[in-house]
């Protein structure tokens, strides 16, 4: 995609629990972080619910659809989500709602495929509820890396020079 065109080096460290540096192919997964936002139509939930189109229903159906689809994904696949916006009060059909997903896989191509499945599930949820998938916003990503040995060795040298802090028991909680 050209995101690193003309870039000579990227200094990156994902600090593990052992606070050490390493090199070579990373053993972890990469991810894309996506916020799906739906728009519907507000209505009084008791007085005229037929006038409403619940964006929250779209979010919930996306989550249900994703959980059924997840059963048929690779064992290495991981995903997580939280509902960020589910409406303001129970007696109003929510006109807006959003859900935040992490799609995790072992390589860039598989992450993109997983993300495309998420998009399809979101579009299906909007169709089922008569709402609109208003936006799909990438909040961040972390592609699987291949870490550079000379940079890792320099980082280790700097850690040795600066020294790590002495952790107290309370710091570990």
Q: Where are the regions a protein language model picked out?
A:
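Metal-dependent amide/peptide-bond hydrolase catalytic core
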Residues: 57-173
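Histidine/acidic-residue-rich, glycine-tolerant segments that coordinate divalent metal ions
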Residues: 1-94, 104
